[in-house]
């Protein structure tokens, strides 16, 4: 077994911990050895409890999930007469967990990349774009699933539009804007709307490149906390950010 050697406060949540354990074992994320991963995860939880640290409920929920998956995989296969005409591949008990891990990994990598861009642009100022079109007709937009790729595509399109407006760059020291501050700003802007709803690009108006990146990171964090949703009526249509009329606690 791999030696447990890490700080209890080093992880953002149970999925972050699982990715760390999988990386330590150097195993395929699509073929997780549930017995070993579950044992190490439970050792981590027990260590936190022995140190009299508060164990967040989400860690305990994941512990129960891992134990359930481990139990299913240890159950003996029933020997049944096989009808090869109707045979379907048996669902892997790990599939749902792997899907959550991959989605979290994509968000984490995207956030890391954007933070690197934020650091690169921290000493630059970009002239705001001219003549931004206002095309929101107030029509109710039906909710569809919006992927991280859809959001990154919309964000990159907005950056290209700023570039086409020929921003003037000058090296200056700018006031640092934290993600928490931008989260408050986004929620405040949404709460000012009657239906707590804004078109995606309206959250990024009159901002520098640095502020754009921070705003996008803030939006991802708000989605993670389920304080906002991003919706799209159909493929290639505008994205809308829907607030839930709540404040950050």
From Swiss-Prot:
UniProt-annotated location(s): Cytoplasm
Record keywords, A-Z: Cell cycle, Cell division, Chromosome partition, Cytoplasm
The UniProt record lists the keyword Transmembrane helix: no
InterPro entries named in the record: ScpA, ScpA-like_C
Source taxon at top rank: Bacteria
A GO CC term assigned to this protein in UniProt: cytoplasm
GO biological-process terms attached to the record: cell division; chromosome segregation; DNA replication
Gene3D superfamilies the UniProt entry points to: 6.10.250.2410, Structural maintenance of chromosome 1. Chain E
Role summary: Participates in chromosomal partition during cell division. May act via the formation of a condensin-like complex containing Smc and ScpB that pull DNA away from mid-cell into both cell halves.
Protein name: Segregation and condensation protein A
High-level lineage: Bacteria, Bacillati, Bacillota, Bacilli, Bacillales
């Amino acid at each position: 077994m791999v030696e447990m050697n890490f700080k209890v406060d080093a992880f953002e949540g149970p999925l972050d911990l699982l990715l760390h354990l999988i990386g330590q074992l150097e195993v395929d994320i699509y073929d997780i050895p549930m017995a070993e991963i579950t044992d190490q995860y439970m050792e981590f939880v027990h260590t936190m409890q022995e140190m009299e640290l508060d164990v967040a409920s989400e860690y305990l929920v994941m512990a129960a999930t891992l134990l359930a998956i481990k139990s299913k995989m240890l159950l003996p296969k029933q020997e049944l007469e096989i009808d090869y005409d109707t045979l379907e591949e048996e669902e892997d008990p790990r599939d749902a967990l792997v899907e959550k891990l991959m989605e979290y990994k994509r968000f984490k990598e995207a956030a890391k990349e954007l933070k690197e861009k934020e650091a690169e642009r921290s000493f630059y100022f970009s002239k705001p774009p001219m003549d931004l079109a206002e095309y929101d007709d107030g029509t109710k937009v039906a909710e569809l699933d919006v992927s991280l790729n859809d959001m990154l595509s919309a964000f990159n399109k907005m950056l290209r539009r700023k570039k086409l407006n020929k921003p003037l760059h000058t090296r200056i020291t700018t006031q640092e804007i934290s993600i928490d501050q931008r989260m408050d700003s986004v929620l405040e802007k949404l709460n000012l709307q009657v239906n707590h709803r804004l078109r995606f690009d309206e959250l990024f108006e009159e901002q520098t490149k640095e502020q754009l990146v921070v705003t996008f990171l803030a939006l991802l964090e708000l989605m993670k906390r389920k304080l906002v949703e991003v919706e799209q009526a159909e493929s290639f249509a505008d994205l809308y950010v829907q607030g839930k009329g709540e404040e950050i606690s």
